[in-house]
Amino acid sequence: MLNVNIICVGKLKEKYWTMAVAEYEKRLKGYCRFKITEVNEERLPDNPSDAEISSTLEKEGQRIIKNIGKGAAVAALCIEGKIISSEELAGFIDKTALGGVSEIDFIIGGSWGLSKQVKDTAVLKLSMSRMTFPHQLARVMLCEQIYRGFQISTGGKYHK
């Protein structure tokens, strides 16, 4: 069974986000081994300097990279990523699994994004939209899209 992980910066703070993610975790059990790993978010002042932002991205990036599985296919969510359809995401998951890779790690950065080092590990740079969303909502949306991808691949009725 395929291992699918989300490695993200920060914790879900509101119960409604936690409940939404828990629902998709439950739904995904029949399709993959699903896990979410939260790495600590760096604290920054209200108006951080470029150097402070760069340092934050580097520290968070190191924490993320430590959690990427050996041989995993990495998909990083980033602003410059490619916008793809749900069907294309299903195809990425299928192609990765059929290619002999046993793990896909999806990466969600913190408020300032991802370090170049993290982005460079990615086989897919993915954008949810040209719009900006809170990272907590992006996590829920990604969980839903992963579930939808498995439904598409298996001919489930969830995707219309």
Predicted segments — roles?
Residues 12, 79-82, 110-113:
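Short glycine-rich anion-binding loops that position phosphate/pyrophosphate groups of nucleotides
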Residues 36, 74-76, 125:
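Conserved beta-strand scaffold positions in the cores of enzyme catalytic domains, especially
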Residues 1-28:
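N-terminal beta1-alpha1 ligand-phosphate binding loop
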Residues 112, 116-160:
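Structured adenosyl-cofactor binding patch, chiefly the S-adenosyl-L-methionine
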Residues 7, 35-37:
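General small-molecule cofactor/ligand-binding pocket signal
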Residues 3, 102-106:
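Loop/turn-to-beta-strand initiation segments
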Residues 40-102:
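S-adenosyl-L-methionine/SAH cofactor-binding core of RNA-modifying enzymes
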Residues 32, 71-72, 122:
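Short, well-ordered alpha-helix to beta-strand connector turns
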